[in-house]
């Protein structure tokens, strides 16, 4: 699926057939340069299943289909959101947020694909998320998340990539607003508190080898993951 509208339909149909518990939703395609490059109008969102979310510091096995690793801001949203009326705005959004945390997302395809040529590629693969690792959460207080320095590094591979939360669809709070309004429009109701992952502040960082990746976001703290590489099966 190259066209995002068709991919959205496919994703929603597939998600409706999956009976696994959903822990939240992710924003994808939130980098404005990527939106312009691929001539898309806006990001999209996808469901995130409980089995794909791990505790801080856990290990993740990757393979050839893995695109890379991301660092993002995630929010815990109160169950009361589902009974709210009207659209979510930047003025009323704070009352639905209970916690905020740094998060690592390992991204890659389930299908045999390489690279990103359209949002349809990502969307038809459920947003191409493999695993999420949530760092220590903090009780939410209003503060400016729109200009926080971020960094993800792996000392073993001599990798270090700097970023900023202002690359995430204006800012992570705006990305959250986008997702919540899409969830509301699609009449999703988890009937519980849930997480929203707002998109990468460092782009998609290639994983050059195994080791510990540490993600740091100013004012929020750190999150880490131990990356293992699956050995190809011999025939």
Describe the predicted segments one by one.
Residues 1-171, 176-177, 209-212, 220-226:
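Catalytic-core "active-site belt" of small-molecule-metabolizing enzymes
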Residues 26, 234-235:
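Basic side chains
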Residues 136-138, 202, 233:
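Short, well-ordered turn and helix-capping elements at secondary-structure junctions
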Residues 175-204:
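A conserved acidic, glycine/proline-rich C-terminal tail/linker
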Residues 201-205, 219-222:
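Short, charged beta-turn/beta-strand-edge "cap" motif at the junction between a beta-strand
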Residues 227-233:
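Conserved small/polar residues in nucleotide/adenosyl-binding loops
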